[in-house]
Design a protein with these regions (language model features):
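HDAC/HDAC-like amidohydrolase catalytic core signature
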Residues: 1-193, 198-342
C-alpha cells in the first residue's frame, strides 16, 4: 500500500492545550507521525510517496473562503499584536444572539472560526494544514487512477473541522475534501467510515443534508465524551441527507466484543449502500491506554479492525485522524493496515 507523506507537518508544533483544569503540551504532536511511520515500517509498509500540490479550489469546495483565509493569516495578525513566538488562540467564542460576522481583528476571527481551545495556531500551522490537504488529495488521485488502497498520513487531523469552524486539533477536513474530489471526478457514491474514538462532528456537519456521501461513525457516546453536543444515534441526516448519517455511539470502557458488533453493523450498511470508494477516517485513540480516550481495545484488536474493513471489498482510502498513546500508536496503526492487507 502506498503511503502519502510530507515532512511539512512538523511546522505545526510547540503549542499547548487546555485539558480541563490544566495547561499541557499538545497531545497532537509531530512525534505522533514519527511513531506512525516507524510502526508502518515495522509492519512492512515503506512505499512512501510525496504529495502533489493541488489548487485551492478543492478546499473551497468544502470550506468557506473567509475561514480558509483566517487560517492562512491568523498567526501573522497575532504576531503583529503580541510579537513572534507563542500561539494564537481564542478568548471568546461566537454565541447565539451575537454578531458572528468577523472583522479584521484576529480576536474576532478566532472567536468566529474556532469552537474550542484545542486549535492553537503557530507560525507553521498553515503550511502543515495546507500540506495535509495535498496529502489527502494525492491519495484520492491515486485511487481515482486505479489504486485499490492508499494511506494518506495527514497531520493535523481533520474530522472535527466543519465548513467554517476549526476545533479538536482539526483545521481543514481532509476526509471531506478527499470525498469531494472523488465526486468531482465523476465517482458518484462515496462512503466515509470514521473509527476515531471521538465523533467526527465536522464531517457530519459538512454532509448532513447531502445524499452523495454516506457517513458512518463509531465513537464514544457524546454524553460522556468530546465533542459532547453531536454524535447521537438519532442524528440520521436531514433534507436530502436523511438516512445518510449513521452514528454508532458506545459507552466508556467498550472492549472488542461490543466494538466488533458496531463495526460489523457499519460494514453491513456499507455493503448495502455499495459505494464506489470507501474513505476511512482512521483514529486509534480507541486503544485502552490512550490519554484522551476511554475505550478498552487491545493492540491485537486493530488487526481485526483492518480485516473487517477489508471485507467491504472496496477501493479504500485511509486518512489518519487521532491516536495519542505514544507507546502503542505505531503498532496499532500498523496492525490496522496489516489486517486490511491480509
Amino acid at each position: 500500500m502506498k503511503l502519502i507523506y510530507t515532512d511539512d507537518h512538523r511546522e505545526h508544533a510547540g503549542a499547548k492545550e487546555m485539558r480541563y483544569d490544566q495547561m499541557i503540551p499538545m497531545s497532537e504532536s509531530p512525534e505522533r507521525m514519527d511513531l506512525v511511520i516507524q510502526g508502518l515500517a515495522d509492519a512492512g509498509f515503506q512505499d512512501i510517496v510525496k504529495p502533489d500540490v493541488f489548487p485551492d479550489d478543492h478546499i473551497h469546495a468544502i470550506h468557506d473562503p473567509g475561514f480558509v483565509r483566517f487560517l492562512e493569516v491568523a498567526y501573522s495578525l497575532w504576531k503583529k499584536e503580541f510579537g513572534p513566538g507563542g500561539f494564537a488562540t481564542a478568548y471568546t467564542f461566537g454565541m447565539r444572539g451575537m454578531d458572528q460576522v468577523p472583522n479584521e481583528s484576529v480576536h474576532s476571527m478566532l472567536s468566529c472560526y474556532t469552537f474550542d481551545v484545542c486549535v492553537p495556531i503557530v507560525a507553521g500551522t498553515w503550511k502543515a494544514v495546507r500540506s495535509a490537504v495535498d496529502v489527502a488529495l494525492t491519495g484520492s488521485a491515486a485511487i481515482t487512477a486505479g489504486e485499490r488502497a492508499v494511506f494518506s498520513l495527514c497531520r493535523p487531523p481533520g474530522h472535527h473541522a466543519s465548513g467554517d469552524l476549526a476545533g479538536g486539533y482539526c483545521y481543514l477536513n481532509n476526509a471531506a475534501i478527499a470525498a469531494q474530489f472523488y465526486l468531482n471526478a465523476g465517482i458518484d457514491r462515496i462512503a466515509i467510515l470514521d473509527v476515531d474514538y471521538h465523533h467526527g462532528n465536522g464531517t457530519q456537519r459538512i454532509f448532513y443534508e447531502r445524499n452523495d456521501v454516506l457517513y458512518l461513525s463509531l465513537h464514544a457516546r457524546p454524553e460522556d465524551e468530546y465533542p459532547f453536543l453531536m454524535g447521537y444515534a438519532q442524528e440520521t441526516g436531514a433534507c436530502e441527507g436523511e438516512n445518510y448519517n449513521v452514528n454508532l455511539p458506545m459507552p466508556l470502557a467498550t472492549a472488542w466484543h461490543d466494538y466488533r458488533e458496531a463495526l460489523q453493523h457499519a460494514i453491513s450498511r456499507l455493503q448495502a449502500y455499495r459505494p464506489d470508494v470507501l474513505i476511512v477516517s482512521l483514529g486509534v485513540d480507541t486503544y485502552k491506554d490512550d490519554p484522551v480516550g476511554g475505550f478498552a481495545l487491545e493492540s491485537e484488536d486493530y488487526l481485526r479492525i483492518g480485516e473487517l474493513i477489508s471485507l467491504a471489498g472496496l477501493p479504500t482510502h485511509f486518512i489518519l485522524e487521532g491516536g495519542y498513546a505514544m507507546a502503542a500508536l505505531g503498532r496499532n496503526v500498523g496492525n490496522v493496515i496489516t489486517g486490511f492487507e491480509k
